[in-house]
Amino acid sequence: MPATRSISTRAIRIDQPGGPEAMRLIEVPIGEPGPGEIRIRHRACGLNFIDVYHRTGLYPLPLPASLGMEAAGIVEAVGEGVTHLHAGDRAAYASTPPGSYCEARVMPAKCVVKLPDGIDFETGAAMMLKGLTAQYLLKKTLPQEGLKAGDHILFHAAAGGVGLI
């Protein structure tokens, strides 16, 4: 059986809930992607309120925990069965499990999309979770009855991430 290549990356982890001082920069191993997975090297990652809620324990995570829900970067490797992404592709994601506060990671390819050429890494990383939230609010939250093209919709707290899209 061939040996699997192991590389390492730096990542932000917490061992207990707390303020920013709870975050630690550590070295962690990452391997090759398995079937249905990709390895992505981050160029930018998003910061969201849910990340703060995870860090403070408001939304508890099993500890120790990695933080971060969205990022953008370059696909380094793809696992068996992945057809929509290739090594060298620019890509972005918003996904669980948390862990985007790192230089690189292996994750499910089904959660990753190609980043269009006209979108830089910073924008790609910052818009994924907010964009999915806006799409959910528009398409899945009731009531939808009576809405038609041209109607105006008000998002409360528009100074947050969704309001800045």
Model-found features: residue ranges?
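Conserved beta-strand elements of the Class I
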Residues: 12, 38-39, 154
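Mid-domain Rossmann-like dinucleotide-binding core that forms the NAD(H)/NADP(H) cofactor-binding site
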Residues: 127-165
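A structural motif shared across PLP-dependent enzymes of the aminotransferase-like
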Residues: 95-110
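Basic/polar N-terminal segments that are highly enriched at the extreme N-terminus
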Residues: 1-10
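Short pre-catalytic strand/loop immediately N-terminal to key active-site residues, enriched for Gly-Thr
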Residues: 119-127
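Nucleotide donor/acceptor-binding cores
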Residues: 9, 89, 150-152
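Short N-terminal binding/cap micro-motifs at the start of the first secondary-structure element
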Residues: 18-23, 49-51
